[in-house]
């Protein structure tokens, strides 16, 4: 009987190792690291303004009072479509607000609230931080320092 013909040994398949998995995100948004920066406060004739960002740099986020109109404007640096959304997350409240560019060609997105809106109180007293999510921009995780409360209270 003839010996069976050996089958050819298959060529080893070269595979590229998969990319490393992304760094795990915190299980809960409130545990995410704080966005680098500090709050500062500035008083003016129309009320107060709290600004968050790197020292000596452009503000990433602002809470601006218009006392005469009884309104607070939330301003996020960055460009967005003509209409977008800004979601504010606190320990007790999550709310999505309609947002628009702050002006023609503006590098800021804004959302406006009545100065008495309970969302503002939730931002001022949340545990650890509050989050600002704006469509198309990175999420900001901001501490509720005293400047936040000062800007809000300057409108009441």
Region annotations inferred by a language model:
Residues 65-102:
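Mid-length scaffold segments of soluble, non-membrane domains
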Residues 1-45:
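Compositionally biased, proline/threonine/alanine/serine-rich low-complexity intrinsically disordered stretches
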Residues 60, 83-85, 129:
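Exposed beta-strand and adjacent loop surfaces of beta-rich binding modules
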Residues 94, 101-156:
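Internal interaction segment
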